[in-house]
């Protein structure tokens, strides 16, 4: 249980029974001193995964946490950021429950690494559901470049009014995840 004790004493993010919670940023709705939201990018799982096989409980914690996150995957195939964002709502009409490519791609990378370590098709269904969603969003929401490349918007919501921007850091992370 040393891995868990070390994690619990590290930082302001917390694992709860249904996912990884981070303090809500000032521009999220709701926000405040003691407001947290469930974040798709469950970085503590990455930490446990990296401690295998030196830490005997790391494998069990990784599997349980990834199973919990798989249950949070919505009907579209992504892990929603549940609170609203003032600027996404104001600039693009994107409300609560939006898709954030960065957080989802970070979680995808964790699933890919875990699937490679554990083998036996573990997490394939979750990975494939997400990749199906991502392929659909890329196909329907991309912005084409002059040379035929695709820029995938950083955020998405089923009721979005205006397609948002594409950031290099989000795009590069997506390309690396697809490569892996």
Where are these regions (language model features)?
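Well-ordered alpha-helical scaffold segments within catalytic/enzyme domains
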Residues: 42-59, 105-120, 172-180
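Long, well-ordered core segments of solenoidal/helical folds
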Residues: 2-34, 59-81, 122-148, 180
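Solvent-exposed loop and edge beta-strand segments that line ligand/cofactor-binding
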Residues: 20-49, 88-108, 155-172
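Generic detector of leucine side chains in alpha-helical contexts
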Residues: 49, 61, 66, 88, ...
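Flexible internal linker/loop segments at domain or repeat junctions
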Residues: 141-163
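Substrate-binding cleft of extracellular glycoside hydrolase catalytic domains
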Residues: 67-123
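Hydrophobic alpha-helical segments and helix-packing faces
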Residues: 123, 127, 167-174
């Amino acid at each position: 249980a040393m891995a868990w004790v070390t994690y619990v004493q590290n930082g302001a993010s917390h694992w709860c029974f249904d996912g990884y919670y981070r303090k809500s940023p000032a521009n999220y709705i709701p926000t405040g001193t003691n407001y947290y939201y469930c974040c798709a990018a469950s970085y503590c799982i990455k930490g446990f995964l990296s401690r295998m096989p030196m830490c005997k409980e790391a494998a069990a914690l990784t599997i349980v946490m990834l199973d919990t996150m798989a249950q949070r995957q919505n009907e579209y195939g992504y892990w929603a950021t549940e609170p609203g964002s003032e600027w996404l709502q104001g600039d693009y009409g994107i409300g609560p429950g939006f898709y954030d490519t960065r957080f989802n791609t970070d979680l995808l990378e964790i699933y890919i690494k875990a699937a490679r370590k554990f083998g036996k098709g573990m997490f394939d269904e979750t990975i494939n559901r997400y990749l199906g969603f991502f392929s659909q969003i890329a196909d329907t929401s991309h912005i084409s470049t002059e040379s035929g490349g695709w820029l995938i918007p950083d955020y998405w919501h089923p009721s979005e009014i205006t397609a948002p921007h594409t950031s290099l850091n989000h795009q590069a992370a997506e390309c690396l995840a697809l490569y892996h």
